[in-house]
């Protein structure tokens, strides 16, 4: 009896350790964020059929264009089964790179947003988004993600000036995809292709304003709103939406959050390890007791 209970408990604890220490080779490592609705559709429903059709259209269209929007089925909307969606690649990607990114996003979104009526997956080089309510052409400046790098040296006036110039140039540029550079400082901004010119400028102005006020004194930073983003880095490349190797460590808030999570996880794993060792020890003692059950100290 002791052996059975001990074995069961040991297996449970080992499973807990595995679940708390996920593999770093997860297939979703290269996405920046995912937003999924809590509302779920039923498997094998009409909505799922149309969603699968939409996602397939994303992949097949990347050879012709970096951006496209779809409504499935076409014609009069049917509230319970109609799905709206867009995909968009970074403005300077070639068709092959665009197709690779969108295909990867489509392959991942099913696991990240399983049976969700809406899903929004932002990758390094592209995004895909779908919903059961139309968001096409609708302005949305909701803040989704922002972060700043390490502060620059206060006496590095040259870098501060370059960063300010690059961020400013993103706001005065033309088009929905904008890049800027000054020496070793690079920046990029892009808005969703379904926005009008004025909506795009409005969204980018908000994102760039946040970037300048929050991260203007940092080695880099990024701001992602629902319909646009802006980022810059010192020593990085505008070809990357996320900071390059010289971006620096995360800001103070990010460090505190990450350190707290790390410490908590280390404590939990330490406690579980001690419990496992205790269980193994008790199992060993129990085995000895059964062998020596006629001994007085074990009766």
From Swiss-Prot:
Residues 29-135, 137-237 form the Gnk2-homologous domain. Disulfide bonds join 36-113, 89-98, 101-126, 148-215, 191-200, 203-228. Its main location: membrane. Residues 265-285 are annotated as: Necessary and sufficient for plasmodesmal targeting. Disruption phenotype: No growth defects. Two-fold lower callose accumulation in plasmodesmata than wild type. More susceptible to infection by the plant pathogen Pseudomonas syringae pv. maculicola. Level of salicylic acid (SA) is comparable to wild type but plasmodesmata closure is impaired. However, overexpression leads to growth inhibition and chlorosis in seedling stage, with levels of SA fifteen-fold higher than wild type including all forms of SA, and probably triggering cell death. Residues 1-25 form the signal peptide. It is a single-pass type I membrane protein. Induction: By the Pseudomonas syringae pv. maculicola effector HopW1-1. By salicylic acid. GO terms for biological process: defense response to bacterium; response to other organism. Residues 286-299 are cytoplasmic. Highly expressed in inflorescence nodes and rosette senescent leaves. Mostly expressed in cell wall junctions between leaf epidermal and mesophyl cells, and to a lesser extent at the cross walls between epidermal or cortex cells within the hypocotyl (at protein level). Low vascular expression in seedling and mature leaf, but high expression in senescing leaves (at protein level). Modulates cell-to-cell trafficking. Has a positive role in innate immunity. Required for systemic acquired resistance (SAR) which is mediated by the signaling molecules azelaic acid (AzA), glycerol-3-phosphate (G3P), and salicylic acid (SA). Negative regulator of plasmodesmata permeability triggered by SA during immune responses, through regulation of callose deposition. Delays the trafficking of Tobacco Mosaic Virus (TMV) movement protein (MP). Required for symplastic signal transport. This is Plasmodesmata-located protein 5.
């Amino acid at each position: 009896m002791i052996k059975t209970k001990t074995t069961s408990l040991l297996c449970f604890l080992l499973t807990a350790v595995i679940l708390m220490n996920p593999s770093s080779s997860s297939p979703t490592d290269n996405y920046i964020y995912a937003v999924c609705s809590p509302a779920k559709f039923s498997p094998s429903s009409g909505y799922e059929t149309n969603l699968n059709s939409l996602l397939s259209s994303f992949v097949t269209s990347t050879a012709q264009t970096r951006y496209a929007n779809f409504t499935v089925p076409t014609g009069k909307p049917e509230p319970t089964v109609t799905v709206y969606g867009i995909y968009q690649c970074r403005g300077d990607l070639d068709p092959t790179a665009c197709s690779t990114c969108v295909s990867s996003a489509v392959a991942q979104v099913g696991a990240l947003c399983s049976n969700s009526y809406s899903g929004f997956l932002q990758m390094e080089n592209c995004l895909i988004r779908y919903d059961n309510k139309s968001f096409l052409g609708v302005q949305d400046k909701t803040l989704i993600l922002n972060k700043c790098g390490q502060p620059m040296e206060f006496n590095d006036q040259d870098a501060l000036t370059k960063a300010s110039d690059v961020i400013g140039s993103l706001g005065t540029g033309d088009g929905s995809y904008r890049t800027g550079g000054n020496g070793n400082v690079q920046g990029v901004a892009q808005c969703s292709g379904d926005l009008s010119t004025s909506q795009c400028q409005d969204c980018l102005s908000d994102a760039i304003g946040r970037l300048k006020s929050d991260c203007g004194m940092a080695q880099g930073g990024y701001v992602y709103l629902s319909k646009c983003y802006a980022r810059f880095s010192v020593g990085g490349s505008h070809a990357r939406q996320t900071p390059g190797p010289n971006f620096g460590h995360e800001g103070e808030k990010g460090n505190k959050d990450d350190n707290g999570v790390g410490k908590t996880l280390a404590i939990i794993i330490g406690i579980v390890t001690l419990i496992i060792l205790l269980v193994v020890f008790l199992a060993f003692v129990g085995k000895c007791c059964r062998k020596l059950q006629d001994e007085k100290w074990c009766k």
